[in-house]
Amino acid sequence: MHIPVMLNEVIKSIKIIPNGTYIDATFGCGGHSRCILSKLNEKGKLIVIDRDPKSIEFACSIKDRRLIPIHGNFSKILKYSIKYKIFGKVQGILFDLGLSFSQIKDSNRGFSFMHDGPLDMRMNNLHGISAKEWINNANIKDISFVIKEFGEEKFYKKISNVICKYRKIKNINTTKELVNLINKACGYFYKKKHPARRSFQAIRIYINNELQELKLALNDIIKIISPKGRIVFISFHSLEDRIIKKFIINNSRKKIYPYKLPILESKIKNDNIYKLKYFKKIQPSKKEILYNKKSRSAILRFAEKLKYD
Ligand SMILES: C[S@@+](CC[C@H](N)C(=O)[O-])C[C@H]1O[C@@H](n2cnc3c(N)ncnc32)[C@H](O)[C@@H]1O
């Protein structure tokens, strides 16, 4: 069963107004959405986005006229906000990044190094290239780069060498085959954590273009929310958290102009219109980690849009 991560903290930080408009940009199994809906009155609205067709199929099965499901990438959030006439009127947006419970546990999706299945790893398995296609065709430099950069894996050279040697003889088709190769390359060095953890994370991030998706969404979200609106992020690894932290910090500062440069007051106001108030990061409690081990690496960051006046 999917347990939404830091549910109480999300609800508190997104600060629900009962007749407000909210976006859950990562619907998943709908854990957070269900709770947000329960806090809205009949005038409230919840737009939910997910790139996974199964997740949105599930959202569509929920009969609630306040809920608007969108199958697509959250990098298109600006386009969706215009289409649904909520641009500048959203009181809160939630990004709960990473994979949902149903994606991880379904061995046919190929996300898990714990279960054998086809090496796919696409969140939207109707589009794009699968991990299998990529790993059997990419050059060694690209494989090394992905495992090093997106997995922060120090044995990236060993792993990519073993992969490229093996595929000269036979294609890598399954998660188990890939896990065995990674074990062969560096299993000896990993005593506590699974040797394939970082490489699987890296390949998944690459296949789904996850960091770029996040950066594109960040370009637009401040414009979409209303003054006093909140943006809440839950991330599960340092690459995403760094991007989020940088985004919040950069947008929390007022623009500073060179001394004595003649600038119109209207320009200063305009430049400072989309600013954020930054709150302290939150991590799951010991109690939560005990009953939901998957929450242990989660970091929640949130910010509020201020209006210059
Ligand atoms: C951790 S799960 C969300 C779980 C959800 N909060 C819940 O409580 O059930 C993340 C979801 O985000 C989706 N997702 C990840 N990146 C996305 C993107 N760029 N655009 C749209 N959906 C995305 C995944 O398909 C997955 O279903």
UniProtKB/Swiss-Prot annotation:
Its main location: cytoplasm. Keywords: Cytoplasm, Methyltransferase, rRNA processing, S-adenosyl-L-methionine, Transferase. Coiled coil: none annotated. Transmembrane segments: none annotated. The keyword rRNA processing applies. Pfam families: Methyltransf_5. It catalyses: cytidine(1402) in 16S rRNA + S-adenosyl-L-methionine = N(4)-methylcytidine(1402) in 16S rRNA + S-adenosyl-L-homocysteine + H(+). SUPFAM superfamilies: Putative methyltransferase TM0872, insert domain, S-adenosyl-L-methionine-dependent methyltransferases. It is found in: Cytoplasm. InterPro entries: RsmH (IPR002903), SAM-dep_MeTrfase_MraW_recog (IPR023397), SAM-dependent_MTases_sf (IPR029063). One of its GO terms (molecular function) is rRNA (cytosine-N4-)-methyltransferase activity. Its EC number is 2.1.1.199. GO terms for cellular component: cytoplasm. The keyword Secreted does not apply. NCBIfam families: 16S rRNA (cytosine(1402)-N(4))-methyltransferase RsmH. Specifically methylates the N4 position of cytidine in position 1402 (C1402) of 16S rRNA. Belongs to the methyltransferase superfamily. RsmH family. This is Ribosomal RNA small subunit methyltransferase H. It comes from Wigglesworthia glossinidia brevipalpis. The lineage of its organism: Bacteria, Pseudomonadati, Pseudomonadota, Gammaproteobacteria, Enterobacterales. The gene is rsmH.
